[in-house]
Amino acid sequence: MKPRSGDKLKIDGIKLSGELVQINLLPGTDFSAARLFCEMAGRRINMPLVTLDAAADRLAGACCIAAEDLARAQPVLEAASGALQVIERVGSLTVFPHRARFDLFECMLSGFARRGLPVHAIASSLAALTFTTDYGRLDEAAAAVLEKAALPDNHAPFRPEFKVRQI
């Protein structure tokens, strides 16, 4: 149900990530997403965000790793430097539930534009809509969304309090 003019969109939550490194898989190269994922898995590097785009038999996309995993990922990134773009100091902002609501996407995109916030990647599912932006501006990104969207009473954007690491 679309809100009346002046009403805010109702959302259930906003999750902000810790500091991430975004790895963009560039189209038109011989380096595959499967190879990237296998290389990261072999180094026990978790990817908390993955989004892929397939068009005309070409695969492009982005994934994120924790900033503290960058040194362990460096050999993979250097070996595939022409096929990857690396963006450091990225964070993700996830709004839920999404439920394929175009008005929520519009709210987030226009909020980012009003504040001049970069959008490095967008990922969606029926449950959530995620934007990546500059890590140092995540709180500003949340404020931009909350100009047009409303959380339930006694809720605020949250960050993870702990992280599980594979050993």
Locations of the language-model features?
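A conserved regulatory-domain signal marking ACT and ACT-like small-molecule sensing domains
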Residues: 1-167
